[in-house]
């Protein structure tokens, strides 16, 4: 694996490398789009659609939908910004990176509200309040941990790289940790999604738990997980290959040297 991502280990010519990048990029968009499409079909067709807190059972359906849209697809797109737009000015890429992560944060918060409302406002068949205890499953424990880590990553990244005035040496010191934790959180998101899909299927899909057969609902949920994993793999291949890493433009190199010299003289 270390050899695969060694920038000095070159098998493909530059034109072949660019072609491979584009192929994996297209595959990532197809897999990510299918994951979003299928989770929407799963929740709208097989799980009775969407509503807000007037119908907690339907409000829950926003949870997996928004998590796939935000924490999987938009998170992955945010990671890809510096690869897809590696020949654009850094200010453009950085702004788009922050916008996408901010959208992820919004989707994440709405998804969390949906699942907590579902638990807290749950009613029994007679219509009486029957709250479900929060945070008891392994999925919820790991999911909450991922949410906290993501929020911390967002705050640290925003202050360090988007908020003006942070010294360049500090940015350089934080960067490898920022990149590493971003990738790790993204991987754990995919794992958490798989756990959530399995948990929901075990509770709600009676075709295989009681009838012992595959059904469209179960197949749809399983394909959501498959395409989530495939999207994750494609994003990681694109992000971890140093050959596709964004390189500073000539004008940015000059500005960096001027800024560094000014900092040293101070």
From Swiss-Prot:
Q: Which Pfam families does the record associate with it?
A: Cytochrom_B561
Q: How is the cofactor bound?
A: Binds 2 heme b groups non-covalently.
Q: What is one process in the GO biological process aspect for this record?
A: ascorbate homeostasis
- Residues bound to heme b 1 are 63, 134-137, 139, 199
Q: Which residues bind heme b 2?
A: 83, 90, 97, 178, 245
Name the domain of life this protein comes from. Eukaryota
Keywords of the record, alphabetical order, are:
Electron transport, Heme, Iron, Membrane, Metal-binding, Translocase, Transmembrane, Transmembrane helix, Transport
Q: Which GO CC terms are listed, alphabetically?
A: membrane
**Which chain regions cross the lipid bilayer?**
23-43, 62-82, 96-116, 142-162, 177-197, 220-240
What cofactors are annotated for this protein?
A: heme b
Q: Which residue numbers delimit the Cytochrome b561 domain?
A: 27-240
Main location per the UniProt record: membrane
What is this enzyme's catalytic activity, as reactions?
A: monodehydro-L-ascorbate radical(out) + L-ascorbate(in) = monodehydro-L-ascorbate radical(in) + L-ascorbate(out)
| Compartment annotation | Membrane
Recorded GO molecular functions are: metal ion binding; oxidoreductase activity; transmembrane monodehydroascorbate reductase activity
Q: Does the keyword DNA damage apply?
A: no
Q: Which InterPro entries match?
A: CYB561/CYBRD1-like, Cyt_b561/ferric_Rdtase_TM
Residue ranges that the UniProt entry lists as topological domain Vesicular = 44-61, 117-141, 198-219
Per UniProt, L-ascorbate binds at 90, 94, 171
Protein name per the record: Putative transmembrane ascorbate-dependent reductase CYB561 homolog
Species per Swiss-Prot/TrEMBL record: Caenorhabditis elegans
């Amino acid at each position: 694996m270390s050899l695969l991502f060694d920038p000095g280990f070159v098998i493909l010519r530059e034109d072949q490398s660019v072609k491979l990048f584009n192929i994996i990029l297209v595959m990532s968009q197809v897999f990510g789009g299918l994951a979003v499409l299928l989770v929407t079909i799963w929740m709208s067709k097989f799980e009775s659609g969407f509503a807000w807190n007037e119908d907690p059972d339907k409000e829950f359906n926003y949870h997996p939908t928004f998590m796939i849209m935000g924490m999987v697809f938009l998170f992955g797109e945010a990671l890809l910004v510096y690869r897809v737009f590696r020949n654009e000015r850094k200010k453009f890429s950085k702004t788009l990176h922050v916008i996408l992560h901010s959208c992820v944060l919004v989707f994440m918060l709405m998804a969390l509200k949906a699942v907590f409302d579902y638990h807290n406002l749950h009613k029994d068949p007679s219509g009486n309040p029957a709250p479900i205890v929060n945070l008891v499953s392994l999925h919820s424990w790991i999911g909450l941990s991922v949410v906290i880590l993501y929020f911390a990553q967002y705050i640290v990244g925003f202050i360090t790289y988007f908020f003006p005035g942070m010294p360049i040496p500090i940015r350089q010191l934080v960067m490898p940790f920022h990149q590493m934790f971003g990738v790790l959180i993204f991987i754990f998101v995919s794992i958490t999604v798989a756990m959530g899909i399995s948990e929901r299927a075990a509770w709600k899909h009676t075709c295989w738990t009681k009838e012992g057969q595959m059904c469209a609902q179960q197949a749809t949920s399983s394909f959501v997980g498959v395409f989530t994993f495939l999207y994750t793999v494609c994003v990681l291949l694109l992000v971890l290959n140093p050959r596709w890493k964004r390189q500073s433009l000539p004008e940015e190199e000059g500005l960096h040297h001027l800024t560094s010299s000014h900092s040293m003289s101070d």
